[in-house]
Amino acid sequence: AEVDSLWQTDRLISKEPFLECMSVMAGLAGTTKKIKFGMNVASLGLRDPLQTAKQCATIDYLSEGRLLPAFGLGSNRSRDFIASGTSTKARGQRMNEALEIMNRLWTQEDVTFKGKYFEYEKASIMPRPVQVPLPLWIGGSSDAAIERTAKFATGWQGSFETPEEARVIVDKIQSATIKHGRSIDSDHFGTGFGVRFGSWDEEPVKKMAADFEKRTGKEAVRGFVVGGADEILTRIQSYADCGVSKFILRPTGTGDADMQEQTEQIIEEVLSKTSHLRSTP
C-alpha cells in the first residue's frame, strides 16, 4: 500500500497553523501530477453552494480530474460558527439544499433553484468538473446524515465512530441507497483518525487530547491512536473488519520536523504492512 491521496482539514478559526482547505486544493492541483486530494471535511454549513461548486469545478479542471470533495455539517461546537456569526440552526437543511444545487451545477447547463435557504436563477458554471460524476464524499453519523449520504454521495467518510458504530452506519447507508434507486461501492466507505508514534503521557499528546475533547465533546481515544505501528494497524484492521476500507491517517506533532518524522513513520511502518488487510462488507 502507498499514499494515494492527500487530505486537508477544514478549520477557519485556530491559534495553531491551519491552511484554508480550498486554497490548499488549488495549490496541490498546480504542484502535483498524479496524486489525488480532498478536504477532510469541508463544512457546508459555512459555505455558499454556488461559490463552492465553482471552486471544486475549477480545481478538478486544473488537476485534470484529481479532486475528492468531501463535505459535512461542521460541529455545532466549532468556533468557526461563533466567530463568523453563523447560526448552527437548520444547518442540515441548508446542507441538503446546497448539495442538490452543487450536484446540478456540476452537470447541468443552467440551474434555477428556489429553496428555503438558497435561491438561484439560471446559474451556470464553466468549465464543469473533468470527473463525471464528480466524486462526493459526505461525513456524519446521524439519521439525517445517513439519508443525505444515501441520496447524494458516492462515498461516506466517518470521523469519531468506533468500528462497530461504523459497521451499523455502513449498513444503514447501503440500505437507504436502495430507496433512492442508487448504490455506493462497497469500497467507498472510509474513516480518519489522528496518529501519534509515542505515549499518551507525553505533554504534547496530553494537550492534543484535551483540545480534542473540548472541541468535540468526545473521548480522545475515539479520534487518535497513540503508540506504535501495531496499535495503528490493529485499529485499521478493526475498521476493515466492519466494512471500512479507506483511511485518512493524520500525523500529529509539534512543529515541522516532528510532523515530518511522524509522517515518515506512518509511510515506512504502517503503510508498508497494510497490503494484506481486507475489508469485510
Regions inferred by a protein language model and the residue ranges of each:
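Active-site-adjacent structural elements that line small-molecule/cofactor binding pockets in enzymes
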Residues: 1-281
